[in-house]
Amino acid sequence: MDEDEKDRAKRASRNKSEKKRRDQFNVLIKELSSMLPGNTRKMDKTTVLEKVIGFLQKHNEVSAQTEICDIQQDWKPSFLSNEEFTQLMLEALDGFVIVVTTDGSIIYVSDSITPLLGHLPADVMDQNLLNFLPEQEHSEVYKILSSHMLVTDSPSPEFLKSDNDLEFYCHLLRGSLNPKEFPTYEYIKFVGNFRSYNNVPSPSCNGFDNTLSRPCHVPLGKDVCFIATVRLATPQFLKEMCVADEPLEEFTSRHSLEWKFLFLDHRAPPIIGYLPFEVLGTSGYNYYHIDDLELLARCHQHLMQFGKGKSCCYRFLTKGQQWIWLQTHYYITYHQWNSKPEFIVCTHSVVSYADVRVERRQELALEDPPTEAMHPSAVKEKDSSLEPPQPFNALDMGASGLPSSPSPSASSRSSHKSSHTAMSEPTSTPTKLMAENSTTALPRPATLPQELPVQGLSQAATMPTALHSSASCDLTKQLLLQSLPQTGLQSPPAPVTQFSAQFSMFQTIKDQLEQRTRILQANIRWQQEELHKIQEQLCLVQDSNVQMFLQQPAVSLSFSSTQRPAAQQQLQQRPAAPSQPQLVVNTPLQGQITSTQVTNQHLLRESNVISAQGPKPMRSSQLLPASGRSLSSLPSQFSSTASVLPPGLSLTTIAPTPQDDSQCQPSPDFGHDRQLRLLLSQPIQPMMPGSCDARQPSEVSRTGRQVKYAQSQVMFPSPDSHPTNSSASTPVLLMGQAVLHPSFPASRPSPLQPAQAQQQPPPYLQAPTSLHSEQPDSLLLSTFSQQPGTLGYAATQSTPPQPPRPSRRVSRLSES
């Protein structure tokens, strides 16, 4: 009994321990099964153990390979992995890793090419390197890549194992969001060496498969690649952040209506680098890219109108001075009591450069017609054969070859649109190569005058500028034919993509030339209209006849067309006034004096000519009241048309001797009416300031005989003129209407005889004044403040030196 009980107890304890062990084993197998990927069905214990064993084996192999390939130098931090360290090194060097075969095919490129050159790795891989180089550098870069292949069919192992670093400079095409923009090239430096690999992928159709001949190809399985680090010649201080394909990253912020930060959540610092207290109170526009400000302003205006919306993709400046692409969904929150806008809630999402480029190109495709020529970088997405872009032949590229000296380009992502420059010469400063605007290489047909009147420009802008298309097309063809021999556009026929790019460039040239031609034609039309207006004014002035009548006490301007021979001889023989200015009147017809050209009527009605008078009083020297009758022979153009008085007009004062009033009465010689005309023979000049003090000797004989006037004279009274007494009479030249003296009958015009017209000397502009001594004061004109748009005249007189004289009253032309 006792033994059976003992055996039963041992068996129970054994079963209990076995059950415990089995339960523990099942738990462990279950845990392993849950850790294995792809466990969609329930696996038995054997399958679970097999998969675990396989995973451990692969893990050991990968660890062994990683230890072999990992950097073991002391300068690599131990807390960084190989991938992290490589990424940091490439960012610090402003470069990327590229693997190129000997024929130029790109088989690998790192992701850091996107923030540096704007290309996606998928677009660059499987393409030829020559597609991204200017045509001038194709031959040299190809020789560098295939130089070691020309010695033997295959490189020696010693050549591949040696540290034969190869360095060269070239220009590389920069990617763009808009494929229609002119290509821009960045000056870069290649540093690398050749290595042999067994599993190099064969390139697909890239347009350069048949570049190398058969003997130069390396045997299959021993391909040689050029592994290089590509660096920018000039480092970029601001560049885009390389965003990997990670789960959606977003953060929330709150802004005021003035777009200032009010709140920033905890998810923002890992993305943008700023802590909340660093951005609170600052404007969001301080962190936006300058090229995106216009688009963001439109989105914010849409938000203020509709209360919610979605922004475009824009660049945000991080704390590490890098641009990260964001897209924002926002809405306006209102106060719960007064329903007034309180603040704006924004949810910012990180977007990749690939998504941004797709969105931008879709927008451009919607805005632009589909027939527009596309940039070669856009054609690459369609897996088409890409040749070197040919439009560079038609442009002024500056240098024909590769610069021998390193010339880094000073460029940044924030200024790529405005820093397009031509490729530098070998001795020039480092610049960025781009295909310049097409009009810079073509000869300009004409240049607009730099100093055009503002009024003329406004008239030219409002005039119709319709232009015949045939003339512009002929001009464009002629300019292109002239530029083709110089730029070397004599290459074989290009593919369709190149032809479309050339056609787009030529169309741009044509449009610019047509616009320039329209501006020139508008300017020519404006000048023709101005010339026509001047001709009309000259015809109007020539047709107008102004008659002037002499009034006894008043000073008048008389242009004696015919003077007595005795007076003429006396005036010509007197040497006292050798430099007396004369009014030269051109007579187009014999016996007829040219028509008077009056100065601006508005100015003449406001000005009075005051003559100097001596202290000796004259009897009956008061101004007669202006007669209300106007001459019937006075043309209507006198009151409506404002003409210009030539600057060469000189005023000569003829002062009669103090005689009785009866002697001042007109003689029978005044019975003949004469036509009074002036011709605009010289350009207009303003009055000189010193003309008011000029004096000249009188042309009156010492015997007291007054020079007879053979021509009727006219008075133009001003409405503000008043008669004065005989002791202080102030004769005033009154313009505006003709006054007929009551003692003079209306005279009829009589033509001159041909003989008299031939012998007639140039008439003088004369005005009689009162005389105090033998040599009276001449008619003195003072300057006036010329109003804008009015034309003035100057009475230029020569003043010979004279001894001091008694004080006289100076005649002046003053404003009324």
UniProtKB/Swiss-Prot annotation:
- Cross-referenced CDD domains, in alphabetical order? bHLH-PAS_NPAS2_PASD4, PAS
Compartment(s): Nucleus
Give induction info: Expression in the retinal ganglion cells and heart oscillates in a circadian manner.
Coarse class of the protein's main subcellular location = nucleus
Which Gene Ontology molecular function entries are recorded, alphabetically?
A: DNA binding; DNA-binding transcription factor activity, RNA polymerase II-specific; metal ion binding; protein dimerization activity; RNA polymerase II cis-regulatory region sequence-specific DNA binding
Bias-annotated ranges (Basic and acidic residues): 1-10
Q: Which GO terms describe its cellular component?
A: cytosol; nucleoplasm; nucleus; transcription regulator complex
Q: What happens when the gene is disrupted?
A: Mice exhibit altered sleep and locomotor activity. Show alterations in sleep homeostasis, altering the electrophysiological properties of neurons after sleep deprivation. Display normal patterns of sleep throughout the light period, however during the active, nocturnal period, they remain awake nearly continuously for the first 8 to 9 hours of darkness and tend to fast rather than readapt to eating in daylight. Exhibit a dysregulation in the lipid and fatty acid metabolism pathways and a significant reduction in daytime contrast sensitivity.
Alphabetically ordered keywords of this record: Activator, Biological rhythms, DNA damage, DNA-binding, Heme, Iron, Metal-binding, Nucleus, Phosphoprotein, Repeat, Transcription, Transcription regulation
Q: What is this protein called?
A: Neuronal PAS domain-containing protein 2
How is this protein's activity controlled?
Carbon monoxide (CO) and the redox state of the cell can modulate the transcriptional activity of the NPAS2-BMAL1 heterodimer. NADH and NADPH enhance the DNA-binding activity of the heterodimer whereas CO binds the heme group in NPAS2 and inhibits the DNA-binding activity of the heterodimer.
Question: Phosphoprotein: present as a keyword of the record?
Answer: yes
Q: Where is this region: Disordered?
A: 1-21, 364-431, 610-639, 685-705, 742-816
Q: Which GO terms describe its biological process?
A: circadian regulation of gene expression; circadian rhythm; circadian sleep/wake cycle; DNA damage response; locomotor rhythm; positive regulation of behavioral fear response; positive regulation of DNA repair; positive regulation of DNA-templated transcription
Instruction: Please give the superkingdom of this protein's source.
Output: Eukaryota
Region listing for Sufficient for heterodimer formation with BMAL1, E-box binding and for the effect of NADPH, in residue ranges: 1-61
- Spell out the Pfam families in the cross-references: HLH, PAS, PAS_11
Residues in bHLH domain copies: 9-59
Q: In which tissues is it expressed?
A: Expressed in the retinal ganglion cells (at protein level). Expressed in the hypothalamic suprachiasmatic nuclei (SCN) of the brain. Also found in spinal cord, and to a lesser extent in colon, small intestine and uterus. Exhibits a diurnal variation in its expression in the brain.
Q: Which residues form the PAS domain?
A: 82-152, 237-307
Please list the residue ranges that the record marks as compositionally biased, kind Low complexity.
Answer: 400-413, 623-639, 745-759
Q: Where is the composition biased (Polar residues)?
A: 420-431, 780-789
Would I find Transcription among this entry's keywords? yes
Chain residues that bind heme b: 119, 171
Task performed by this protein: Transcriptional activator which forms a core component of the circadian clock. The circadian clock, an internal time-keeping system, regulates various physiological processes through the generation of approximately 24 hour circadian rhythms in gene expression, which are translated into rhythms in metabolism and behavior. It is derived from the Latin roots 'circa' (about) and 'diem' (day) and acts as an important regulator of a wide array of physiological functions including metabolism, sleep, body temperature, blood pressure, endocrine, immune, cardiovascular, and renal function.
